[in-house]
Amino acid sequence: MRLEGKTAFITGAGSGLGRAASERFAEEGATIVAADVDTDGLEATADRVADLGGEVTTHELDVRDGDAFRAAVDAAAEEFGLDVLLNNAGVSHDRMDFEAIDDDVRDRVLDVNVKGVWNGCQAVLPHFKEQGSGAIVNTASLAGVIGAPQLTGYSLSKGAVVNFTRALAAEVGPDGVRVNAVCPGVTDTPMPRKGQSDEEWAQRKEELARHYPLKRLGEPEDVANAMLFLASDEADWITGQALVIDGGFSCA
């Protein structure tokens, strides 16, 4: 199995991509340290990992809190060792014109999406450097590569994650640490369907899929498989990359 004997710390694990990654990593042998502010979602993820036969522990964690992030990582490293960090927790904002985005909305998006990634990397790097190995996978977005009109705050945050990933990869590569990012297009997770009924979302998915050469939106498993690859030893000579997973949208 591709992550046999490894431990992965996964933020935003209570739903969506984080839950899919927790399940996929567990299927490949990883011990899962699942973190999220959503304790109900965490419990559901833990149950699903356990049903797969995986070992899992949970931490209620707001990634904006650097001290809490370090404490959770230190505890995981002491109990299990630590090999992979998946910085996946993230938020967006409603589509609106740039001038309508107020400071509170902007700050929340930047604090979770940028400071959260920063805090996670600062928490794990002492452990990774000491052992001379480790893989960090940051969840960015296609919006961080090509930009998304009326999602300028979100685009700003994810663009920062992409360039931060490249800079940090160059810095810590000599320490044996790899840092990569995934940049998904629209994926069927709670974030893009927020505020929509099942019927409304089904119609919206059909409309959006027309713009993708592969004629469908992404599923969480599509992104989780890419995360798994970048976290595994199969990607041992890959670092500083922002892997676009978008069904061909950006080339159409």
Predicted feature descriptions by range:
Residues 141:
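Residue(s) in the substrate-gating loop at a strand-loop-helix junction
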Residues 92-95, 146, 210, 228, ...:
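Short C-terminal tail/terminal secondary-structure segment
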Residues 121, 157, 165:
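Active-site helix of classical SDR
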Residues 7, 14-15:
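Conserved glycine-rich cofactor-binding loop
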Residues 181, 202-234, 238, 247:
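C-terminal helical subdomain
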Residues 126, 170-174, 236:
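Alpha-helical segment proximal to the catalytic Tyr-Lys
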Residues 96-98, 102-110, 208:
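Substrate-binding pocket helix/loop in short-chain dehydrogenase/reductase
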